[in-house]
Amino acid sequence: MVENQGNVEAHGKPKKVILSLSLKESSKINDSQNVSNVSSKEKCETEALLREENKENLSSDSIRQMIFGDEMAGFVDTGEKPPCSYATLIGLAILQSHNKQLTLSGIYTWIRNTFRYYLNHDGGWQNSIRHNLSLNKAFIKVEKPKGKTLKGHYWTIDPDHMQNFVSVRLHRSHSTDSNSKKRPSSKCHEIKPLTTREIPLARKRSRLNSFNSSTSTSGSSSNVAAEVSNDASQPSNQDSSLNSNIVKPPLPPSNVQSNSSSSENVPKPNAETQEDLPTIDAHESSLYENVNDSRLYEVPACRNMALNTGYSDADPGYLRTSFRSNSHNSLPYSANEEEDVLQADFLVSQQSSMVSSYVSSRDPHSMPYYRREPIPLRPSSRFYEYTRPTYGRTDTSCSAPGAFCSTQINSPSSYINYSKCAPSSPTLSLQKHREHVKSLLYVPDLTPSFDGSDPWNPSSQLLSEPLFDQHSFQSSLDDLMSVTCFRDSPELNHESSGYSSAPLMPSNRAFINDFSL
């Protein structure tokens, strides 16, 4: 029992000791937690105080470390433009000064000494510095002390905006990294531009499809054979190129019956030409459907033909082209041999026969008609002799532009006749013009003459009349000269024998003429 009690006691003592130790340890832990809480608060307060002290007293290295971080602390000037704004440069210059204030010239000198880029470039960066100082609210103007005689003022940073310059970080451009990380675009997303050859083919196909869907009637097989025979004499490769260039806009429905007579004038094929016709596939046969219909017209898309786009789709097409009157020779054009005919504002239905005759009558040895160069129309000049076109239009019964007119319309064509005797130079033409004007403004000579040869002189006609008594006029003149007022005249003093009836002097002749008039 004693042993057990001893054991119990022995076992009990350690329990008490353990409990006492645990209580002591818990009290120590609580004390350490309180100390740690107090130390964390003290650390926060000390850090805040240090920050405020650092704002007031900062060295150059600490300013670079706070403003730009590690990048600016190890900054090496390479002569390139620094990757920061002008406001940041101004704040950096002011914070590195001794009194945290600088003049405008001091800011300039610090930027030049720190960055070589601004030392070599004296351009518009100084204006940018002045604009930032005057417009940015973070900078304040401070007057200089009264003791100093220097003019001007200092610039400092507003304490409310000081944190903006402390927490700022350098933002470098990552253009090189972004360009290197760009993935190459896949080929499926690439857009291939349409070639110049594919664009007109798509337009032609869409136009033919819309035409086939719009037409409801089909022409007879004889009309198809008659239309195909017009181009039977041409090679097969030319036929394929012409068929792809067919333009077929429909005419108004009111012209269906009236234009049926014009379709009958199409020349019929011969038996020999029908045997040489090329075979037409099923796909191509759809292109030849309704080709000879009166509502359609066929014009080869040549370089020397152009449709006038001034009319709507419902109106009939108008063709403006120039044909050569004699197309049998393929020699260059000469003005002495041929004449140009300007055919404008003709209905295409009226010119279809002209085009077909022109195609059928072409010389097979000459170059193809669709490759022939267009005939240039010579510029107008005052030396060309034009024949006036027919201005009077006899047909006035058509109310609408697309209505069919039974009467024949006068041709507006004008034949250009080139003058063969044009002047060689402008100087010669000007000389001829001046001579012509002088001949119109010619004034006959009005000088007096007594021989009666000048018919325009009235004095000569007066003296030549038989009723005029010249002897009596001379005697009266002698009596007049004997008057006392003419005694001292030079003529009387010169001749002592008195006044003689000698021929008059030229001066006296003028006086007589005036007196007679």
Swiss-Prot record:
Residue stretches of biased makeup (Low complexity): 209-223, 254-270
DNA-binding region, residues: 81-172
UniProt-listed InterPro entries: Fork_head_dom, TF_fork_head_CS_2, WH-like_DNA-bd_sf, WH_DNA-bd_sf
GO biological process: cell cycle switching, mitotic to meiotic cell cycle; meiotic cell cycle; positive regulation of transcription by RNA polymerase II; regulation of cell cycle switching, mitotic to meiotic cell cycle; regulation of transcription by RNA polymerase II
GO molecular function: DNA-binding transcription activator activity, RNA polymerase II-specific; DNA-binding transcription factor activity; DNA-binding transcription factor activity, RNA polymerase II-specific; RNA polymerase II cis-regulatory region sequence-specific DNA binding
Subcellular location: Nucleus
Residues covered by region (Disordered): 170-278
Database matches in SUPFAM superfamilies: Winged helix' DNA-binding domain
UniProt keywords, alphabetically: Activator, DNA-binding, Meiosis, Nucleus, Transcription, Transcription regulation
Ranges annotated as biased composition (Polar residues): 230-246
Keyword Ribosomal protein among record annotations: no
Tree of life domain: Eukaryota
Assigned GO CC terms: chromatin; nucleus
Pfam families per the UniProt record, alphabetical: Forkhead
General function of this protein: Functions as a meiosis-specific transcription factor. Binds to the 5'-GTAAAYA-3' consensus sequence of the promoter of the spo6 gene.
Record PANTHER family: CHECKPOINT SUPPRESSOR 1-LIKE, ISOFORM A-RELATED, FORK HEAD PROTEIN HOMOLOG 2
Protein name per the record: Meiosis-specific transcription factor mei4
Source species: Schizosaccharomyces pombe (strain 972 / ATCC 24843) (Fission yeast)
The encoding gene: mei4
